[in-house]
């Protein structure tokens, strides 16, 4: 598999249930969550020793952006490390609340919608070459991303005027544009704002904001892995059938509501195609591409998962993927509970289970319960996730950032970092600019660290 820099940014939903008379707003709860961060970072926007960025986003949503990763399992591991870091903040915040006489349970949800209809995202980042034609990448990717929910949606019980329906995607109802430079106002599928966080003459960052937040490690692996294969093909000039959509926004919603994958959507040229038709085209090209360029274990794993997910939808046999793909895992859980208790899909108890699936608190969240019972498959291990809370990826620029932060903190020195800059806030204001995200060794950074 061709080397590429990946990153995932995840916004988390926050809520709190209180035991006594005292109540706090979501903003106040979020501030309690970040109090420990602010105490050492003097800000609610910090970079961590593992190279990641942690900050409080608009609307009291904690956001975790993984460090630069160049391997899919590494990316999944660092994405999960973000959950563990936020879980630690949650436990600390509950302790603070208790110490101040405010009894309460804080909940952090790795999902994309709250009960008030607000949406928050999971953004994927892919480094692409500046030389390629970005508009072609967007044109080819758009139909793939609109239909990708078949293989990696998080699943959601949606209450509609005609009753409750089970949907493939949480995010689909909240996307309003195909390609745009905005992220919050219009919520496009692909964000075109040109911020490469790298050498702008060589690289561009593809920012995909249509995806669901995934609890399943394997779903995250497939989500990013399949998109990476499509990108690889576009970069190497593979030709695709034209599946340009007449109305991508209508299509993404219609596809989300159809678990059969067979409902057709209108294409720009007047033809019609189903989500399965479109995904089969991309999948078939990917199989041929990997066979031509030479296979590798990760490409084989992605193609196996991708193919089985499409087979599961086509044959309506979700057992093919109900240990690996979030929407199928959740559907199995909800259906078993419904059948056991004789409940309608619209039951508040089902809505509660739907939400609890995304609770990141171990021992309380339903996905964690399934994982402990060995009812879901994994892509990484607990020991690797624990290590990734403090250790940056060793093969990318993240190592330089993480090593610098750790050394500066150990030396008690004041510093400032972002994705490309490492700066000592001393009289000399020494700064190192790290423009190559693939570079994990840099003599300038080593000299800066040795001077501490």
Curated annotation (Swiss-Prot):
Residues at which Mg(2+) binds? 9, 55, 63
What's the Enzyme Commission number for this chain? 6.3.1.19
Keyword terms: ATP-binding, Ligase, Magnesium, Metal-binding, Nucleotide-binding, Ubl conjugation pathway
Which parts of the sequence bind ATP?
53, 66, 419
Q: What is annotated as the active site?
A: 57
Q: In which pathway does it act?
A: Protein degradation; proteasomal Pup-dependent pathway; Protein modification; protein pupylation
Q: Specify whether Disulfide bond is a keyword of the entry.
A: no
**Which reactions is this enzyme annotated as catalysing?**
ATP + [prokaryotic ubiquitin-like protein]-L-glutamate + [protein]-L-lysine = ADP + phosphate + N(6)-([prokaryotic ubiquitin-like protein]-gamma-L-glutamyl)-[protein]-L-lysine
Question: Key word Magnesium present in the record?
Answer: yes
| Enzyme class name | ligase
Q: Which residues form a coiled coil?
A: none
GO process terms (BP):
modification-dependent protein catabolic process; proteasomal protein catabolic process; protein pupylation
Q: Name one GO molecular function term.
A: ATP binding
Q: What else is known?
A: The reaction mechanism probably proceeds via the activation of Pup by phosphorylation of its C-terminal glutamate, which is then subject to nucleophilic attack by the substrate lysine, resulting in an isopeptide bond and the release of phosphate as a good leaving group.
Role, per record: Catalyzes the covalent attachment of the prokaryotic ubiquitin-like protein modifier Pup to the proteasomal substrate proteins, thereby targeting them for proteasomal degradation. This tagging system is termed pupylation. The ligation reaction involves the side-chain carboxylate of the C-terminal glutamate of Pup and the side-chain amino group of a substrate lysine.
Which family does this protein fall into? Answer: Belongs to the Pup ligase/Pup deamidase family. Pup-conjugating enzyme subfamily.
Q: What is this protein called in UniProt?
A: Pup--protein ligase
Its organism's taxonomic lineage begins at: Bacteria, Bacillati, Actinomycetota, Actinomycetes, Pseudonocardiales
């Amino acid at each position: 598999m061709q080397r590429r820099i990946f990153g995932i940014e995840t916004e988390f939903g926050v809520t709190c249930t209180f035991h006594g008379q005292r109540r706090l707003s979501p903003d106040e709860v979020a501030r309690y969550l970040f109090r420990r961060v602010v105490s050492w970072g003097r800000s609610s926007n910090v970079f961590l020793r593992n190279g990641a960025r942690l900050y409080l986003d608009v609307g009291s949503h904690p956001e975790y952006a993984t460090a630069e990763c160049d391997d899919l399992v590494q990316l999944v591991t660092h994405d999960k490390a973000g959950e563990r870091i936020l879980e630690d903040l949650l436990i600390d915040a509950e302790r603070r609340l208790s110490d101040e006489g405010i009894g309460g349970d804080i909940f952090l949800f790795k999902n994309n919608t709250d009960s008030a209809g607000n949406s928050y995202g999971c953004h994927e980042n892919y480094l692409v070459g500046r030389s390629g034609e970005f508009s072609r990448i967007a044109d080819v990717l758009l139909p793939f991303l609109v239909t990708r929910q078949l293989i990696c949606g998080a699943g959601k019980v949606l209450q509609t005027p005609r009753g409750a329906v089970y949907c493939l995607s949480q995010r689909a109802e909240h996307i309003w544009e195909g390609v745009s430079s905005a992220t919050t106002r219009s919520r496009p599928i692909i964000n075109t704002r040109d911020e490469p966080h790298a050498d702008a003459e060589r690289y561009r960052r593809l920012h995909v904001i249509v995806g669901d937040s995934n609890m399943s490690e394997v779903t995250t692996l497939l989500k990013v892995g399949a998109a990476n294969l499509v990108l690889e093909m576009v970069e190497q000039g593979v030709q695709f059938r034209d599946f340009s959509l007449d109305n991508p926004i209508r299509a993404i919603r219609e596809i989300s509501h159809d678990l059969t994958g067979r409902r057709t959507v209108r294409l720009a040229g007047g033809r019609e195609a189903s989500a399965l038709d479109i995904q089969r085209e991309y999948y078939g090209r990917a199989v041929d591409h990997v066979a031509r360029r030479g296979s590798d274990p990760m490409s084989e794993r992605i193609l196996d998962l991708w193919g089985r997910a499409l087979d599961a939808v086509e044959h309506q046999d979700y057992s093919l993927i109900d240990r690996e793909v979030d929407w199928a895992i959740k559907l199995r859980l909800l259906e078993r509970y419904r059948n056991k208790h004789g409940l309608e899909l619209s039951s508040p108890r089902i809505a509660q289970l739907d939400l609890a699936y995304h609770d990141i608190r171990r021992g309380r969240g339903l996905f964690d319960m399934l994982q402990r019972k060995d009812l879901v498959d994994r892509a990484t291990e607990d020991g690797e996730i624990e290590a990734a809370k403090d250790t940056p990826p060793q093969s990318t620029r993240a190592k330089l950032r993480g090593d610098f932060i750790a050394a500066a903190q150990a030396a008690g020195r004041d510093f400032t970092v972002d994705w490309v800059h490492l700066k000592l806030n001393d009289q000399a204001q020494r700064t190192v600019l790290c423009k190559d995200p693939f570079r994990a060794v840099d003599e300038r950074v080593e000299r800066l660290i040795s001077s501490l």
